Amino acid sequence: MRLMVSGGGTGGHIYPALALIKQVKQSEPDSQILYVGTSKGLESKIVPDSGIDFKTINIQGFKRSLSLENFKTIGLFLSSVVKARKMVKEFKPDVVLGTGGYVSGAVVFAASMMGVPTVIHEQNSVVGVTNKFLSKFVKKIAISFEAAASQFPTKKVVLTGNPRATEVAQIKPSGLSQFGLDDKVPTVLIFGGSRGAEKINQVTIDTLEELMERPYQTIFVTGRVHFERLTKDIDLAKYQGKIAILPYIANMPEILSNMEVIVGRAGATSLAEITSLGIPSILIPSPYVTNDHQTKNAMSLVNNDAAEIIKESDLTSEALINTLDTLMLDQKFRNVMAENAKKMGQPRAAENLYDVLKSVSK
Protein backbone atom coordinates (compact mmCIF):
# COMPACT_ATOMS: atom_id res chain seq x y z
CA MET A 1 0.00 0.00 0.00
CA ARG A 2 1.14 3.51 -0.86
CA LEU A 3 -0.42 5.60 1.89
CA MET A 4 -0.38 9.37 2.31
CA VAL A 5 -1.39 10.60 5.77
CA SER A 6 -2.08 14.16 6.88
CA GLY A 7 -2.98 15.50 10.29
CA GLY A 8 -1.47 18.13 12.51
CA GLY A 9 -1.47 20.81 15.11
CA THR A 10 -2.21 18.74 18.21
CA GLY A 11 -1.30 15.32 19.51
CA GLY A 12 -4.94 14.31 19.19
CA HIS A 13 -4.57 14.41 15.41
CA ILE A 14 -1.04 13.02 15.26
CA TYR A 15 -0.93 10.01 17.60
CA PRO A 16 -3.92 8.21 16.04
CA ALA A 17 -2.21 8.65 12.65
CA LEU A 18 1.04 7.16 13.97
CA ALA A 19 -0.83 4.22 15.50
CA LEU A 20 -2.51 3.56 12.14
CA ILE A 21 0.82 3.78 10.33
CA LYS A 22 2.25 1.22 12.76
CA GLN A 23 -0.63 -1.13 11.92
CA VAL A 24 -0.08 -0.67 8.16
CA LYS A 25 3.62 -1.47 8.52
CA GLN A 26 2.83 -4.59 10.56
CA SER A 27 0.31 -5.79 7.98
CA GLU A 28 2.30 -4.73 4.90
CA PRO A 29 6.02 -4.41 5.68
CA ASP A 30 6.74 -3.23 2.13
CA SER A 31 4.23 -0.37 2.31
CA GLN A 32 5.29 3.17 1.34
CA ILE A 33 4.09 5.96 3.63
CA LEU A 34 4.33 9.75 3.40
CA TYR A 35 3.12 12.05 6.16
CA VAL A 36 2.21 15.63 5.23
CA GLY A 37 2.04 18.19 8.05
CA THR A 38 3.12 21.71 8.91
CA SER A 39 6.54 22.96 9.92
CA LYS A 40 5.19 24.64 13.06
CA GLY A 41 2.95 21.89 14.47
CA LEU A 42 3.94 19.11 16.87
CA GLU A 43 4.05 16.74 13.93
CA SER A 44 7.21 18.41 12.58
CA LYS A 45 9.18 16.78 15.40
CA ILE A 46 7.12 13.73 16.36
CA VAL A 47 6.72 12.26 12.87
CA PRO A 48 10.37 12.44 11.68
CA ASP A 49 11.47 11.11 15.09
CA SER A 50 9.25 8.10 14.39
CA GLY A 51 11.22 7.37 11.20
CA ILE A 52 8.39 8.30 8.83
CA ASP A 53 8.93 10.30 5.63
CA PHE A 54 7.64 13.81 6.27
CA LYS A 55 6.84 16.81 4.07
CA THR A 56 5.36 20.17 5.01
CA ILE A 57 2.74 22.60 3.75
CA ASN A 58 2.32 26.15 5.05
CA ILE A 59 -1.24 26.72 6.25
CA GLN A 60 -3.12 28.36 9.12
CA GLY A 61 -6.60 28.28 10.62
CA PHE A 62 -9.40 30.78 10.20
CA LYS A 63 -10.07 33.37 12.89
CA ARG A 64 -13.54 33.00 14.41
CA SER A 65 -14.13 36.75 14.17
CA LEU A 66 -14.12 38.81 10.97
CA SER A 67 -10.47 39.49 10.24
CA LEU A 68 -8.14 40.50 7.43
CA GLU A 69 -6.09 37.47 8.44
CA ASN A 70 -8.85 35.29 7.00
CA PHE A 71 -8.15 36.62 3.49
CA LYS A 72 -4.55 35.59 3.97
CA THR A 73 -5.75 32.19 5.21
CA ILE A 74 -7.86 31.66 2.09
CA GLY A 75 -4.85 32.48 -0.06
CA LEU A 76 -2.69 30.09 1.94
CA PHE A 77 -5.30 27.33 1.63
CA LEU A 78 -5.48 27.68 -2.14
CA SER A 79 -1.70 27.66 -2.49
CA SER A 80 -1.57 24.68 -0.10
CA VAL A 81 -3.99 22.76 -2.31
CA VAL A 82 -1.72 23.44 -5.30
CA LYS A 83 1.30 22.19 -3.35
CA ALA A 84 -0.66 19.17 -2.09
CA ARG A 85 -1.67 18.27 -5.66
CA LYS A 86 2.00 18.24 -6.61
CA MET A 87 2.82 15.95 -3.67
CA VAL A 88 -0.03 13.59 -4.54
CA LYS A 89 1.06 13.51 -8.18
CA GLU A 90 4.65 12.70 -7.22
CA PHE A 91 3.90 10.14 -4.50
CA LYS A 92 1.00 8.40 -6.32
CA PRO A 93 -0.82 7.12 -3.20
CA ASP A 94 -3.31 4.28 -3.31
CA VAL A 95 -5.28 6.06 -0.60
CA VAL A 96 -5.04 9.28 1.44
CA LEU A 97 -6.02 9.53 5.11
CA GLY A 98 -6.77 12.77 6.96
CA THR A 99 -6.83 12.77 10.76
CA GLY A 100 -7.75 16.42 11.35
CA GLY A 101 -6.14 19.82 11.50
CA TYR A 102 -6.12 22.44 8.75
CA VAL A 103 -3.27 20.83 6.85
CA SER A 104 -5.33 17.68 6.28
CA GLY A 105 -8.01 19.85 4.68
CA ALA A 106 -5.70 20.90 1.86
CA VAL A 107 -4.19 17.44 1.35
CA VAL A 108 -7.40 15.41 1.42
CA PHE A 109 -9.29 17.96 -0.69
CA ALA A 110 -6.54 17.96 -3.33
CA ALA A 111 -6.43 14.16 -3.46
CA SER A 112 -10.22 13.91 -3.71
CA MET A 113 -10.28 16.36 -6.63
CA MET A 114 -7.64 14.20 -8.36
CA GLY A 115 -9.75 11.05 -8.03
CA VAL A 116 -7.56 9.45 -5.37
CA PRO A 117 -9.55 7.46 -2.75
CA THR A 118 -9.72 9.43 0.50
CA VAL A 119 -10.72 8.67 4.10
CA ILE A 120 -10.99 10.94 7.14
CA HIS A 121 -10.84 9.93 10.79
CA GLU A 122 -12.78 11.93 13.38
CA GLN A 123 -11.57 11.45 16.95
CA ASN A 124 -14.20 13.47 18.83
CA SER A 125 -17.93 13.35 19.49
CA VAL A 126 -18.26 16.81 17.95
CA VAL A 127 -17.03 17.01 14.37
CA GLY A 128 -14.16 19.38 13.64
CA VAL A 129 -14.42 22.15 11.03
CA THR A 130 -11.93 20.52 8.66
CA ASN A 131 -13.56 17.09 8.71
CA LYS A 132 -17.02 18.61 8.29
CA PHE A 133 -15.79 20.34 5.12
CA LEU A 134 -14.03 17.21 3.82
CA SER A 135 -16.98 14.89 4.48
CA LYS A 136 -18.57 15.98 1.18
CA PHE A 137 -15.60 14.75 -0.86
CA VAL A 138 -14.19 11.63 0.81
CA LYS A 139 -15.06 7.97 0.19
CA LYS A 140 -15.32 6.92 3.84
CA ILE A 141 -15.53 8.58 7.25
CA ALA A 142 -14.12 6.69 10.23
CA ILE A 143 -15.40 7.76 13.65
CA SER A 144 -14.39 7.06 17.24
CA PHE A 145 -17.69 7.87 18.99
CA GLU A 146 -21.17 6.86 17.85
CA ALA A 147 -22.31 10.40 18.70
CA ALA A 148 -20.38 11.72 15.69
CA ALA A 149 -22.30 9.58 13.18
CA SER A 150 -25.33 11.87 12.87
CA GLN A 151 -23.09 14.79 11.87
CA PHE A 152 -21.88 13.06 8.69
CA PRO A 153 -23.45 11.52 5.55
CA THR A 154 -24.74 8.21 6.94
CA LYS A 155 -23.65 5.95 4.06
CA LYS A 156 -20.01 6.98 4.42
CA VAL A 157 -19.67 6.42 8.17
CA VAL A 158 -17.78 3.51 9.76
CA LEU A 159 -17.30 3.19 13.53
CA THR A 160 -13.66 2.14 13.85
CA GLY A 161 -12.58 3.59 17.18
CA ASN A 162 -9.35 5.52 17.72
CA PRO A 163 -6.20 3.68 16.51
CA ARG A 164 -4.34 4.82 19.61
CA ALA A 165 -6.46 2.30 21.54
CA THR A 166 -4.78 -0.58 19.72
CA GLU A 167 -1.30 0.71 20.44
CA VAL A 168 -1.97 1.11 24.16
CA ALA A 169 -3.66 -2.29 24.44
CA GLN A 170 -0.49 -3.93 23.06
CA ILE A 171 2.00 -2.15 25.34
CA LYS A 172 3.67 -4.21 28.06
CA PRO A 173 2.97 -2.57 31.44
CA SER A 174 5.74 -1.41 33.77
CA GLY A 175 5.62 -1.44 37.58
CA LEU A 176 5.11 1.38 40.04
CA SER A 177 8.25 0.82 42.11
CA GLN A 178 10.00 3.30 39.78
CA PHE A 179 7.87 5.97 41.48
CA GLY A 180 8.47 4.67 45.00
CA LEU A 181 4.99 3.12 45.15
CA ASP A 182 3.71 -0.38 45.93
CA ASP A 183 2.48 -2.43 42.95
CA LYS A 184 -0.03 -4.21 45.22
CA VAL A 185 -1.80 -1.07 46.47
CA PRO A 186 -4.75 0.36 44.45
CA THR A 187 -3.54 3.44 42.60
CA VAL A 188 -5.11 6.62 41.22
CA LEU A 189 -3.56 8.66 38.41
CA ILE A 190 -4.33 12.40 38.36
CA PHE A 191 -3.17 13.90 35.09
CA GLY A 192 -4.22 17.12 33.37
CA GLY A 193 -2.63 16.36 30.00
CA SER A 194 0.92 16.73 28.68
CA ARG A 195 0.95 20.45 29.53
CA GLY A 196 -0.94 20.04 32.77
CA ALA A 197 -4.14 21.80 33.82
CA GLU A 198 -3.92 24.64 36.32
CA LYS A 199 -7.27 24.10 38.07
CA ILE A 200 -6.79 20.33 38.37
CA ASN A 201 -3.27 20.90 39.69
CA GLN A 202 -4.28 23.43 42.33
CA VAL A 203 -7.22 21.39 43.59
CA THR A 204 -5.02 18.29 43.81
CA ILE A 205 -2.40 20.22 45.79
CA ASP A 206 -5.18 21.29 48.17
CA THR A 207 -6.23 17.63 48.52
CA LEU A 208 -2.81 16.09 49.28
CA GLU A 209 -3.32 15.82 53.04
CA GLU A 210 -6.60 13.97 52.59
CA LEU A 211 -5.06 11.68 49.98
CA MET A 212 -2.33 10.79 52.49
CA GLU A 213 -5.01 9.39 54.81
CA ARG A 214 -6.61 7.14 52.20
CA PRO A 215 -5.93 3.39 51.80
CA TYR A 216 -5.05 3.96 48.15
CA GLN A 217 -1.99 5.64 46.63
CA THR A 218 -1.73 8.41 44.05
CA ILE A 219 0.38 9.43 41.08
CA PHE A 220 -0.04 13.15 40.41
CA VAL A 221 1.44 14.46 37.15
CA THR A 222 1.55 18.25 37.04
CA GLY A 223 2.96 18.92 33.57
CA ARG A 224 6.49 20.29 33.20
CA VAL A 225 5.53 23.96 33.04
CA HIS A 226 3.66 23.82 36.36
CA PHE A 227 5.90 21.54 38.43
CA GLU A 228 8.41 24.00 39.88
CA ARG A 229 5.81 26.58 40.88
CA LEU A 230 3.49 24.00 42.44
CA THR A 231 6.15 22.17 44.44
CA LYS A 232 8.40 25.01 45.62
CA ASP A 233 6.60 25.19 48.98
CA ILE A 234 6.02 21.43 49.30
CA ASP A 235 8.19 18.88 51.09
CA LEU A 236 8.09 16.14 48.45
CA ALA A 237 9.82 13.68 50.79
CA LYS A 238 6.81 13.86 53.10
CA TYR A 239 4.66 12.13 50.50
CA GLN A 240 7.12 9.43 49.39
CA GLY A 241 5.66 5.95 49.30
CA LYS A 242 2.10 7.29 49.22
CA ILE A 243 1.86 10.07 46.62
CA ALA A 244 4.26 10.44 43.70
CA ILE A 245 4.29 14.05 42.44
CA LEU A 246 5.93 14.25 39.02
CA PRO A 247 6.34 16.82 36.23
CA TYR A 248 5.95 14.30 33.43
CA ILE A 249 5.92 10.56 32.70
CA ALA A 250 7.62 9.67 29.43
CA ASN A 251 6.27 6.11 29.38
CA MET A 252 2.69 7.00 30.38
CA PRO A 253 0.99 4.23 28.34
CA GLU A 254 3.11 1.64 30.17
CA ILE A 255 1.68 2.53 33.58
CA LEU A 256 -1.98 3.04 32.64
CA SER A 257 -2.97 -0.60 33.06
CA ASN A 258 -1.75 -0.45 36.69
CA MET A 259 -4.30 2.24 37.54
CA GLU A 260 -7.60 1.56 39.30
CA VAL A 261 -8.96 5.02 38.44
CA ILE A 262 -7.78 7.87 36.22
CA VAL A 263 -8.64 11.52 36.87
CA GLY A 264 -8.13 13.84 33.91
CA ARG A 265 -9.35 15.64 30.82
CA ALA A 266 -11.69 14.12 28.25
CA GLY A 267 -9.59 14.39 25.11
CA ALA A 268 -10.39 11.81 22.45
CA THR A 269 -7.02 10.04 22.63
CA SER A 270 -7.13 9.75 26.43
CA LEU A 271 -10.61 8.23 26.32
CA ALA A 272 -9.56 5.78 23.62
CA GLU A 273 -6.72 4.64 25.85
CA ILE A 274 -8.68 4.23 29.07
CA THR A 275 -11.63 2.44 27.45
CA SER A 276 -9.29 0.12 25.58
CA LEU A 277 -7.82 -0.90 28.94
CA GLY A 278 -11.15 -0.83 30.79
CA ILE A 279 -10.22 1.77 33.42
CA PRO A 280 -12.86 3.75 35.35
CA SER A 281 -12.34 7.49 35.18
CA ILE A 282 -13.28 10.81 36.71
CA LEU A 283 -13.39 13.22 33.79
CA ILE A 284 -12.91 16.98 34.08
CA PRO A 285 -13.51 18.31 30.54
CA SER A 286 -11.49 21.32 29.46
CA PRO A 287 -13.75 24.38 29.13
CA TYR A 288 -11.27 25.92 26.69
CA VAL A 289 -11.77 23.64 23.67
CA THR A 290 -13.80 24.30 20.52
CA ASN A 291 -17.55 23.60 20.79
CA ASP A 292 -17.06 22.16 24.29
CA HIS A 293 -16.28 18.84 22.59
CA GLN A 294 -14.58 17.34 25.65
CA THR A 295 -17.84 17.49 27.61
CA LYS A 296 -19.59 15.63 24.81
CA ASN A 297 -16.74 13.10 24.69
CA ALA A 298 -17.04 12.60 28.44
CA MET A 299 -20.81 12.15 28.33
CA SER A 300 -20.39 9.23 25.93
CA LEU A 301 -18.72 7.40 28.82
CA VAL A 302 -20.91 8.82 31.60
CA ASN A 303 -24.08 7.75 29.78
CA ASN A 304 -22.70 4.21 29.66
CA ASP A 305 -21.81 4.22 33.38
CA ALA A 306 -18.12 4.04 32.47
CA ALA A 307 -17.05 7.33 34.07
CA GLU A 308 -17.94 10.11 36.49
CA ILE A 309 -17.80 13.76 35.43
CA ILE A 310 -16.93 16.94 37.33
CA LYS A 311 -17.23 20.28 35.54
CA GLU A 312 -14.12 22.39 36.02
CA SER A 313 -16.32 25.13 37.49
CA ASP A 314 -17.52 22.64 40.13
CA LEU A 315 -14.08 21.20 40.87
CA THR A 316 -13.11 21.60 44.52
CA SER A 317 -10.99 19.57 46.91
CA GLU A 318 -14.18 18.22 48.48
CA ALA A 319 -15.71 17.25 45.12
CA LEU A 320 -12.51 15.51 44.06
CA ILE A 321 -11.94 13.48 47.23
CA ASN A 322 -15.62 12.51 47.54
CA THR A 323 -15.77 11.28 43.95
CA LEU A 324 -12.47 9.43 44.35
CA ASP A 325 -13.72 7.74 47.51
CA THR A 326 -16.94 6.71 45.76
CA LEU A 327 -14.87 4.67 43.30
CA MET A 328 -11.76 3.73 45.26
CA LEU A 329 -13.53 2.58 48.44
CA ASP A 330 -16.15 0.49 46.63
CA GLN A 331 -14.46 -2.24 44.60
CA LYS A 332 -17.75 -3.74 43.39
CA PHE A 333 -18.89 -0.39 41.96
CA ARG A 334 -15.44 0.18 40.46
CA ASN A 335 -15.45 -3.24 38.81
CA VAL A 336 -18.83 -2.57 37.18
CA MET A 337 -17.55 0.74 35.85
CA ALA A 338 -14.40 -0.97 34.56
CA GLU A 339 -16.50 -3.54 32.70
CA ASN A 340 -18.59 -0.79 31.13
CA ALA A 341 -15.47 1.10 30.06
CA LYS A 342 -14.04 -2.07 28.54
CA LYS A 343 -17.24 -2.65 26.56
CA MET A 344 -16.79 0.79 25.00
CA GLY A 345 -13.15 0.15 24.16
CA GLN A 346 -11.96 -0.51 20.62
CA PRO A 347 -8.67 -2.44 20.98
CA ARG A 348 -8.92 -3.39 17.27
CA ALA A 349 -9.37 0.23 16.17
CA ALA A 350 -6.13 0.40 14.16
CA GLU A 351 -7.02 -2.81 12.33
CA ASN A 352 -10.54 -1.50 11.73
CA LEU A 353 -9.23 1.71 10.16
CA TYR A 354 -6.67 -0.23 8.12
CA ASP A 355 -9.53 -2.38 6.77
CA VAL A 356 -11.41 0.79 5.74
CA LEU A 357 -8.33 2.08 3.90
CA LYS A 358 -7.94 -1.24 2.08
CA SER A 359 -11.60 -1.26 1.09
CA VAL A 360 -11.32 2.03 -0.81
CA SER A 361 -7.69 1.96 -2.03
CA LYS A 362 -6.83 1.62 -5.69
From Swiss-Prot:
Substrates-to-products reaction catalysed: Mur2Ac(oyl-L-Ala-gamma-D-Glu-L-Lys-D-Ala-D-Ala)-di-trans,octa-cis-undecaprenyl diphosphate + UDP-N-acetyl-alpha-D-glucosamine = beta-D-GlcNAc-(1->4)-Mur2Ac(oyl-L-Ala-gamma-D-Glu-L-Lys-D-Ala-D-Ala)-di-trans,octa-cis-undecaprenyl diphosphate + UDP + H(+)
Pfam hit, one: Glyco_tran_28_C
Annotated family: Belongs to the glycosyltransferase 28 family. MurG subfamily.
Listed GO biological process terms: carbohydrate metabolic process; cell division; cell wall organization; lipid glycosylation; peptidoglycan biosynthetic process; regulation of cell shape
Protein name: UDP-N-acetylglucosamine--N-acetylmuramyl-(pentapeptide) pyrophosphoryl-undecaprenol N-acetylglucosamine transferase
Binding-site list for UDP-N-acetyl-alpha-D-glucosamine: T10, G11, G12, N124, S194, I249, Q294
Swiss-Prot/TrEMBL keywords: Cell cycle, Cell division, Cell membrane, Cell shape, Cell wall biogenesis/degradation, Glycosyltransferase, Membrane, Peptidoglycan synthesis, Transferase
GO-annotated molecular function: undecaprenyldiphospho-muramoylpentapeptide beta-N-acetylglucosaminyltransferase activity
UniProt xrefs under Gene3D superfamilies: Glycogen Phosphorylase B (3.40.50.2000)
An annotated GO cellular component: plasma membrane
NCBIfam families linked to this entry: murG (TIGR01133)
InterPro entries given in the database record: GlcNAc_MurG, Glyco_trans_28_C, GlycoTrans_28_N
HAMAP family, alphabetized: MurG (MF_00033)
